[in-house]
Amino acid sequence: MAAKIIDGKTIAQQVRSEVAEKVKARVAAGKRAPGLAVVLVGSNPASQIYVGSKRKACEEVGFVSRSYDLPETTSEAELLELIDTLNADKTIDGILVQLPLPAGIDNVKVLERIAPDKDVDGFHPYNVGRLCQRAPRLRPCTPRGIVTLLERYNIDTYGLNAVVIGASNIVGRPMSMELLLAGCTTTVTHRFTKNLRHHVENADLLIVAVGKPGFIPGEWIKEGAIVVDVGINRLESGKVVGDVVYEDAAERASYITPVPGGVGPMTVATLIQNTLQACEEYHDVEEA
């Protein structure tokens, strides 16, 4: 069986076009365009690339994009003060602080300082808690993006055995909550999991997010499984690969996401969706 490719690039472009249409309609109706503030501390090259793509996506859909590039020497107090200012700014619907932050700045304190209704990354404990309670508001971008991919390909998730490999706060944990909402019987594996192969072989839906190239061999994949590879790993040769051995897995799976061009584009597209949602559902009321 040759797997159908889940084309994240195309779906992400659809999502962005849908948002752009809604923004155009808002502006035509005399409402303001949504605003996103992107905060970068220091000059981590990978972070600069991510931030650049987020800002570009914002401008393409007609958002107001505000950039705050702070030096490596920025103190935690200065960063928190900026967040307070942005929380109070009625033209800003979303605040994104690019991680990782430099040493000496407490990630948790910073993320918790962002107002939950401006937390477009979906990392605030309030938003994670709402997801756990089956009443989500702003949802973490990568997991929500994966759910969107499955929905757009009309993949029925109810009753599937879903296995999430990796238990990070950014992907694995919120992904498990999204899968429960989507009707899956969900298992989360992590570095202490025994007999990982057994779990993978029983997965109807496999989500892999560990950041290790070729971590899951293709022969472990159950015949007909749906494989979502969140990993983005650059080899010494410069080639970008996922956490799953793609060629072998694609022979056994029914659907598979490629790397690059699978999950990655959806993360930014979902950030854009979240910002529009924050604007329309939580901030328009204040202007009425």
From Swiss-Prot:
Query: What's its EC?
Result: 1.5.1.5, 3.5.4.9
| An individual GO BP term | methionine biosynthetic process
Write out the entry's keywords from A to Z.
Amino-acid biosynthesis, Histidine biosynthesis, Hydrolase, Methionine biosynthesis, Multifunctional enzyme, NADP, One-carbon metabolism, Oxidoreductase, Purine biosynthesis
Where on the tree of life does the source sit, at the highest rank?
Answer: Bacteria
Under the subunit heading, UniProt states:
Homodimer.
PROSITE patterns in alphabetical order: THF_DHG_CYH_1, THF_DHG_CYH_2
**What is the protein name given in its UniProt record?**
Bifunctional protein FolD
Record field: catalytic activity: (6R)-5,10-methylene-5,6,7,8-tetrahydrofolate + NADP(+) = (6R)-5,10-methenyltetrahydrofolate + NADPH; (6R)-5,10-methenyltetrahydrofolate + H2O = (6R)-10-formyltetrahydrofolate + H(+)
Family the UniProt entry places it in: Belongs to the tetrahydrofolate dehydrogenase/cyclohydrolase family.
Matches recorded under CDD domains: NAD_bind_m-THF_DH_Cyclohyd
GO MF entry, a single one: methenyltetrahydrofolate cyclohydrolase activity
**Residue sites binding NADP(+) per the record:** 166-168, 232
Q: Which InterPro entries match?
A: Aminoacid_DH-like_N_sf, NAD(P)-bd_dom_sf, THF_DH/CycHdrlase, THF_DH/CycHdrlase_cat_dom, THF_DH/CycHdrlase_CS, THF_DH/CycHdrlase_NAD-bd_dom
Functionally, this protein is described as follows: Catalyzes the oxidation of 5,10-methylenetetrahydrofolate to 5,10-methenyltetrahydrofolate and then the hydrolysis of 5,10-methenyltetrahydrofolate to 10-formyltetrahydrofolate.
Give, as in the UniProt entry, the pathway in which the protein acts: One-carbon metabolism; tetrahydrofolate interconversion
A Pfam family name for this chain? THF_DHG_CYH_C
| Any single Gene Ontology cellular-component annotation | cytosol
